[in-house]
Amino acid sequence: EAIPIKVGGPPPLSXGLPGTLNSDEARDLKLP
């Protein structure tokens, strides 16, 4: 259910930034 939320728009519970995919993916990849 996290995929549709990411594509839908900027999730405040995931990243909270207006980068959506960029912010979410970048953060996820950067996280250990």
UniProtKB/Swiss-Prot annotation:
Disulfide pattern: none
UniProt xrefs under InterPro entries: PsbQ-like_dom_sf
Presence of keyword Chloroplast: yes
One example of a Gene Ontology biological process annotation: photosynthesis
Subcellular location: Plastid, Chloroplast thylakoid membrane
Keywords: Chloroplast, Membrane, Photosynthesis, Photosystem II, Plastid, Thylakoid
Annotated spans, Disordered: 1-32
GO cellular component terms listed in the entry, alphabetical order: chloroplast thylakoid membrane; photosystem II
Organism superkingdom: Eukaryota
Similarity comment: family membership: Belongs to the PsbQ family.
The protein's name: Oxygen-evolving enhancer protein 3
Organism this protein belongs to: Pisum sativum
Gene: PSBQ
